Amino acid sequence: MKNLDKGTVIRTVLLFVALVNQTLIMFGKSRLPISEDQVNTLADALYLAGSTIFTIVTTLVAWFKNNYVTSKGKLQKETLKQKGLTK
């Protein structure tokens, strides 16, 4: 147990809690007071947050990759202009 990192211990404990909860639900006894509406609300919020983060990151990466914003990029643009390969 001394060789396990904190993340492994946390994931193992959460897995155990989830398995116990699922077993109790199978026998008709819910131990975690979580309603289906709460789960749906959380899922919707996580989806919205994930979509927003994905859109922002993708937009920034595409903008950075498609524009000459670094000094190296500006040199590349000048080289392309000199060789007639860009507008």
Curated annotation (Swiss-Prot):
Which of UniProt's keywords are assigned here? Membrane, Transmembrane, Transmembrane helix
Residues in a coiled coil are none
InterPro entries from the entry?
Holin (IPR006479)
Q: How does it sit in the membrane?
A: Single-pass membrane protein
Is Transmembrane among this UniProt entry's keywords? Answer: yes
The UniProt transmembrane annotation reads 44-64
Tell me the Pfam families matching this sequence.
Holin_SPP1
The record's disulfide annotation reads none
Q: Name one GO cellular component term.
A: membrane
Keyword Lipoprotein assigned to the entry: answer is no
Query: Where is the protein localized?
Result: Membrane
Q: Which domain of life is it from?
A: Bacteria
Query: Per the similarity annotation, which family is this?
Result: Belongs to the SPP1 holin family.
The record's NCBIfam families line, in alphabetical order, gives: holin_SPP1
Q: What is this protein called?
A: Uncharacterized 9.7 kDa protein in cwlL 5'region
Q: What is the lineage of its organism?
A: Bacteria, Bacillati, Bacillota, Bacilli, Bacillales
